[in-house]
A protein has these predicted regions:
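Beta-strand/loop substructures that line and gate deep hydrophobic ligand-binding cavities in soluble
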Residues: 10-14, 106-159, 168
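Intrinsic-disorder/low-complexity, polar/charged segments enriched in Ser/Thr/Lys/Arg/Asp/Glu/Gln
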Residues: 27-35, 102, 111, 123-125
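Hydrophobic pocket/interface hotspot
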Residues: 43-46, 94, 126-128, 157
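Short coil-to-beta-strand transition motifs
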Residues: 85-91, 109
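Short, charged/polar surface micro-motifs in flexible loops or helix N-caps
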Residues: 41, 52-53, 88, 97-102
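Hydrophobic/aromatic beta-strand elements that line small-molecule binding cavities or substrate pockets
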Residues: 32-34, 92-94, 111-119
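Short, hydrophobic/aromatic-rich segments at coil-to-beta transitions
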Residues: 78-80, 96-105
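Hydrophobic ligand-binding cavity/cleft-lining segments
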Residues: 1-74, 162-163, 167-172
Length: 172
């Protein structure tokens, strides 16, 4: 399907994601990925901050409010907690968490898993898989819309994690 993959390898697509078990026959599956030049423990806090904002195009899905650019002292996410905040509204729920490894949530009928896959040299693959059961005719549009927003989100999380890791690794 057009728009269903960005930044992922075949092995990223073939791996198992927690959201795979949550939608029996998804009409849309989308995989996104980015290589972050920081270890997983530096990426994880930024992934958990999606609870505070979407980190994509804030002028679109956050009504112009900027997603936080500094780490806030948040407790570890738990199943049942809110998944994200957009436009000042709490949206969705966290379905499962494996701290430092994966965060899975649901919003508007879609389920999504953020997976951190550590690589060599203190780098991390930040992977996102989205699944949804929607009308067949809507799936291509959803995949393209998600591609645009998820790409921006992952690139923002990458930039923030790398910047913060660099500042912590080399203090002023």
């Amino acid at each position: 399907m057009i728009g269903d993959r960005w930044g992922v390898t075949e092995s990223d697509v073939l791996r198992s994601y927690p959201c795979d078990d949550l939608v029996a026959s998804p009409t849309m599956q989308a995989w996104r990925g980015v290589l972050v030049e920081a270890p997983a423990e530096a990426v994880w806090p930024w992934v958990t901050q999606v609870r505070l904002g979407p980190y994509s195009y804030d002028w679109i899905d956050n009504l112009g409010r900027r997603s936080p650019r500094e780490l806030l002292d948040l407790p570890e996410p738990r199943a049942g907690d809110r998944f994200t905040t957009a436009g000042g509204r709490e949206l969705g729920r966290i379905v499962s968490v494996d701290p430092g490894k994966q965060l899975t949530g649901t919003i508007m009928g879609a389920f999504m898993s953020y997976v951190l896959a550590p690589c060599d040299h203190d780098m991390t693959r930040l992977l996102l898989k989205v699944v949804i059961q929607a009308p067949w005719w809507a799936a291509p549009g959803l995949a393209i819309g998600d591609l645009i927003m998820a790409r921006r989100q992952l690139l923002n999380l990458k930039q923030l994690a790398e910047r913060h890791h660099c500042q912590v690794a080399v203090p002023d």
